[in-house]
Structures are given as C-alpha cells and as structure tokens.
C-alpha cells in the first residue's frame, strides 16, 4: 500500500492527493493561458480567474460531498474540513467553478462561451491527473473482482481493499478524460469543424457519458434516497450538451471556434 503522505516536515504533511490536484491545476492553467489569447482573452485573465475559482471550487466540491454524506459528518463535525483525507466531489467543484466563471465573465465583460471553450480541455486534462489522488487514497473504486492481472502490480496492490481486488474505476475515468482531451485537442485544430461553444458541449457529453457508465461500477458513490447522484448529474450534462449543439447548429451567424 502506498503511503498517502508524500512528504513530511515536522508537523507539516503534504499528501499525494493534494499533489495530484495541484499538478492537474498547473497543467490546466498552462493549457488555458496558451489558448486564451487566440480567443481575445488575456493570459492574465486566466490567472486572475484561477486565483478566485480554484479555492472556491475546492470548497464547493467539499460541501457537495459533505451534504450527501451528512449522516456521517453530523457525528464527526471535526472532519468536515479534512479534505486531505479525500472526500471532494468533482461535480461539486465543476458546478461551483462554472458559476464563478459566469460571474467573472460578467464582471470583466468577457464572452463566457469563449471562456468555457478554453476551460473545457484544460479541465479534462486536470481531471485525468487528479483521479490518481483517488488511487493513492484508495477511494472511488469499484466492485470486488477475483484478479487484476491485466494491470501493473503497483495498481493491483493498491486496489486490494478490504480483502479483495477492486475494479480501478479511477483509472477508467482518468483514461476516459485523457482520451477526450486528445480528441478535442486534435479536433479543434481542424478549420471550420467546431462552432463556438461546441468544445464545451463536447466536454459535457463526453465526460457525462463516461461518468454515467463508470459510476455504475463504483461501490462508494454518493447516494440520495437510494439514487446514485452522479449518474443523474451525468445524464443531465449529456442532455444539456446535446441540446446546446442542436440549437447552435440551427442558429445562423454563429462563428466557428477557429475563426
């Protein structure tokens, strides 16, 4: 089993979970800052946005998680802020981040569609890295299986939880996000292939589809009244993405992303 603490200096402990999230953040900021000027948004605007959005997204992700695990946290109030032990919900972070983005664009008079198109691939890449934090913490795993011989030994060992090998759903989602990132990065280079907003719509459809399937394999999903919350949110993302694309394609005068 991998030690969840990457580095310890006196009372200060740096967790792998935090390093995975921060690594994803750094990559996301780099990618977005390189792409932003092509759509008339300065790199400084990206940095300013991240300084506001990232901490709020972490808080939002934690609140989302705590709400749906309230039966536990109401008895352990001191653990509510212990995010270093895991327990942040991606959808909570995404929803918070999207709301902050809309508010930021309104305040700075920026086109939110352009901003969302720039952010989407960057977020996908960050998620691909961030999921490895779940691997270290032995969370976001799937059902018990007899063996995992198709995986490297270090993954097999870390996925041996509570006396059984577990489906590495974190790995499936990480790979799915990475594949989606590669596809959209290649696609957006093709002239007149994507309208403004369709990169963001692709993210909604792609991530929603993958999460909808993968969530069904998990055993530690957040539940509400016996329902897997993330599957319903995923289905909603897919529907929103499809409706968005259909409406954009029917509208006249919508610019191509590459213009």
From Swiss-Prot:
<keyword id="KW-1133">Transmembrane helix</keyword>
<dbReference type="GO" id="GO:0008961">
    <property type="term" value="F:phosphatidylglycerol-prolipoprotein diacylglyceryl transferase activity"/>
</dbReference>
<feature type="transmembrane region" description="Helical">
    <location>
        <begin position="109"/>
        <end position="129"/>
    </location>
</feature>
<feature type="transmembrane region" description="Helical">
    <location>
        <begin position="226"/>
        <end position="246"/>
    </location>
</feature>
<keyword id="KW-1003">Cell membrane</keyword>
<keyword id="KW-0812">Transmembrane</keyword>
<feature type="transmembrane region" description="Helical">
    <location>
        <begin position="194"/>
        <end position="214"/>
    </location>
</feature>
<feature type="transmembrane region" description="Helical">
    <location>
        <begin position="80"/>
        <end position="100"/>
    </location>
</feature>
<dbReference type="GO" id="GO:0042158">
    <property type="term" value="P:lipoprotein biosynthetic process"/>
</dbReference>
<comment type="similarity">
    <text>Belongs to the Lgt family.</text>
</comment>
<keyword id="KW-0472">Membrane</keyword>
<dbReference type="Pfam" id="PF01790">
    <property type="entry name" value="LGT"/>
</dbReference>
<feature type="binding site">
    <location>
        <position position="131"/>
    </location>
    <ligand>
        <name>a 1,2-diacyl-sn-glycero-3-phospho-(1'-sn-glycerol)</name>
    </ligand>
</feature>
<feature type="transmembrane region" description="Helical">
    <location>
        <begin position="167"/>
        <end position="187"/>
    </location>
</feature>
<dbReference type="InterPro" id="IPR001640">
    <property type="entry name" value="Lgt"/>
</dbReference>
<comment type="function">
    <text>Catalyzes the transfer of the diacylglyceryl group from phosphatidylglycerol to the sulfhydryl group of the N-terminal cysteine of a prolipoprotein, the first step in the formation of mature lipoproteins.</text>
</comment>
<protein>
    <recommendedName>
        <fullName>Phosphatidylglycerol--prolipoprotein diacylglyceryl transferase</fullName>
        <ecNumber>2.5.1.145</ecNumber>
    </recommendedName>
</protein>
<feature type="transmembrane region" description="Helical">
    <location>
        <begin position="41"/>
        <end position="61"/>
    </location>
</feature>
<dbReference type="GO" id="GO:0005886">
    <property type="term" value="C:plasma membrane"/>
</dbReference>
<feature type="transmembrane region" description="Helical">
    <location>
        <begin position="12"/>
        <end position="32"/>
    </location>
</feature>
<comment type="pathway">
    <text>Protein modification; lipoprotein biosynthesis (diacylglyceryl transfer).</text>
</comment>
<keyword id="KW-0808">Transferase</keyword>
